[in-house]
């Protein structure tokens, strides 16, 4: 079972990663799906998307939840049933009503916390750099090599996607409402602000 990594972000927040190496049939046979998820899976045309979807459910089971504990609000934001569960093999008891989900290529991840959160996985690709003017301040890419431009644009896209998932309200625009403070790739961290509906949040 290719559970890949657990990253403890703080006392209340942990991210879990799954490296997808199984075939679609193995994943399907080893997850429990509710009726809505089964119907949703059937509508997916991409095998890659199906595997990412199922790997997320494998991660839920890894931390003692199932697909039946997962639900989505009117804006499409995922939540877990409000209960206290213990992660496998861990003594820390997590209040796990908040969850964020992402999958990209051969990885899926979930982030679980007792506060609202957002997480995003992205593979570096040239396309992200080409569309960078649509979602970011391209002055933040000045004086960088082509590879570093792709890397930084990918990071900024992921940051903005995470902020959007955290707030998840209709009308939020990446270029108009989410801004990133200048940072260097080697910083390994950064700061973003959401300016929406006359409210500013860090």
Place the predicted regions along the sequence by residue.
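Core catalytic alpha/beta fold that binds nucleotide/phospho-ligands
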Residues: 1-202
């Amino acid at each position: 079972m290719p559970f890949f990594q657990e990253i403890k972000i703080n006392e209340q927040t942990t991210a879990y990663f799954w490296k997808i190496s199984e075939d679609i049939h193995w994943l399907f046979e080893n997850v429990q799906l509710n009726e809505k998820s089964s119907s949703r899976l059937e509508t997916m045309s991409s095998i890659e998307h199906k595997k990412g979807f199922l790997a997320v459910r494998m991660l839920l089971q890894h931390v003692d939840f199932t697909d039946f504990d997962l639900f989505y609000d009117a804006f499409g934001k995922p939540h877990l049933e409000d209960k206290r569960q213990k992660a496998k093999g861990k003594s820390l008891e997590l209040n796990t009503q908040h969850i964020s989900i992402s999958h990209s290529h051969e990885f899926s991840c979930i982030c679980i916390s007792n506060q609202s959160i957002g997480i995003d996985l992205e593979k570096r690709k040239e396309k992200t750099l080409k569309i960078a003017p649509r979602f970011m301040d391209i002055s933040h890419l000045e004086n960088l090599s082509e590879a570093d431009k792709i890397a930084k644009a990918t990071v900024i896209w992921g940051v903005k996607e995470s902020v959007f998932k955290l707030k998840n309200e209709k009308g939020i625009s990446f270029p108009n409402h989410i801004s990133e403070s200048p940072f260097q790739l080697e910083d390994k961290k950064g700061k973003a602000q959401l300016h929406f509906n006359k409210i500013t949040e860090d």
